[in-house]
């Protein structure tokens, strides 16, 4: 199997500047059909109530909202009209991170992935 240069990352924080969002890996490569985790560190005094949103932008396309997660105890919610289980998001209050998982990566998944946080 050939490697797939899958992702480049950036991040931004919205709201009142209460959350600092960081994605440390600039790119991740994986093999086709493998799953991949994309971490996002959220430095916030209100991590438990921050809403974490995940977006992607494919080359020459508009930014697309994928999924968001409100609580470490609840399931993530997909954008309206999206029913695919290809992506999952979760929050970890011990490490103050959100993880976006992309299942069974295909060449079409190559994009820039962003996380954003606000309360």
UniProtKB/Swiss-Prot annotation:
The keyword Metal-binding does not apply. GO terms for cellular component: external side of plasma membrane; T cell receptor complex. It is found in: Cell membrane. Residues 1-19 form the signal peptide. One of its GO terms (biological process) is adaptive immune response. It comes from the Eukaryota. Residues 24-119 form the Ig-like domain. Disulfide bonds join 40-115. It holds the Pfam family V-set. Keywords: Adaptive immunity, Cell membrane, Disulfide bond, Immunity, Immunoglobulin domain, Membrane, Receptor, Signal, T cell receptor. InterPro entries: Ig-like_dom, Ig-like_dom_sf, Ig-like_fold, Ig_V-set, TRG_var/const_region. PANTHER family: NON-FUNCTIONAL T CELL RECEPTOR GAMMA VARIABLE 10-RELATED, T-CELL RECEPTOR GAMMA CHAIN. Probable non-functional open reading frame (ORF) of V region of the variable domain of T cell receptor (TR) gamma chain. Non-functional ORF generally cannot participate in the synthesis of a productive T cell receptor (TR) chain due to altered V-(D)-J or switch recombination and/or splicing site (at mRNA level) and/or conserved amino acid change (protein level). Gamma-delta TR is a heterodimer composed of a gamma and delta chain; disulfide-linked. The gamma-delta TR is associated with the transmembrane signaling CD3 coreceptor proteins following the stoichiometry: a single gamma-delta TR heterodimer associates with one CD3D-CD3E heterodimer, one CD3G-CD3E heterodimer and one CD247 homodimer forming a stable octameric structure. Upon activation, gamma-delta TR complex associates with FCER1G to initiate intracellular signaling. This is Probable non-functional T cell receptor gamma variable 10. The lineage of its organism: Eukaryota, Metazoa, Chordata, Craniata, Vertebrata.
